[in-house]
């Protein structure tokens, strides 16, 4: 944690959940059924690894990587609906815990909604095509933050999520 982090936050227990692998069902509702056990471990904060849809283009393996985000403003339908996630967060809060989510704001999947709606938000290779600066990460394309409209898009995304969750882990 940062040196200026509020003292009360420094000794909190954070429990990481990757929804897809947390239970056999791999859903928000299944995680909700496990909250009593998670709380009994002394958990103060549940941190969800990326909960957004996973891109299909160039995906790694049969399931793809959750860090190849397809849409910043919704949940992975394999995990459940946005309402399912909101309900899960309400249950987390009812048990006296907080909730944070991963935000992966350096790149998206090549087939992300942003690559279609805002191609100007992306880094381009010398040939003009989308690309990334880490060659073996073929399932992602890098964002280009020299475009200030991208900053506003991401701020708006964070504001949307901040109405639901308590914080973020920035990847």
Task: Outline where the language-model segments fall.
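Rossmann-like NAD(H)/NADP(H) cofactor-binding core
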Residues: 15, 171
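Substrate-binding/active-site clefts of carbohydrate-active enzymes
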Residues: 3-13, 20-26, 32-44, 50-164
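Hydrophobic residues within beta-strands of alpha/beta enzymes
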Residues: 46, 168-170
């Amino acid at each position: 944690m940062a040196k200026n982090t509020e003292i009360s936050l420094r000794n909190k227990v954070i429990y990481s959940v990757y929804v897809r692998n947390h239970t056999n069902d791999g859903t928000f509702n299944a995680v909700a059924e496990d909250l009593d056990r998670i709380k009994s471990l002394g958990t103060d904060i549940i941190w969800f690894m990326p909960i957004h849809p996973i891109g299909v283009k160039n995906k790694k393996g049969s399931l793809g990587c959750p860090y190849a985000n397809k849409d910043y403003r919704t949940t992975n339908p394999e995990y459940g609906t946005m309402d399912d996630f909101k309900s899960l967060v309400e249950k987390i809060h009812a048990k006296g815990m907080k909730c944070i989510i991963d935000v992966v704001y350096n790149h998206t999947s090549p087939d992300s909604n942003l690559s279609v709606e805002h191609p100007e938000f992306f880094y381009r290779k010398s040939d003009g095509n989308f690309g990334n600066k880490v060659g073996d990460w073929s399932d992602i394309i890098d964002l280009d933050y020299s475009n200030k409209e991208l900053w506003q898009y991401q701020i708006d995304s964070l504001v949307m999520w901040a109405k639901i969750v308590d914080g973020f882990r920035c990847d």
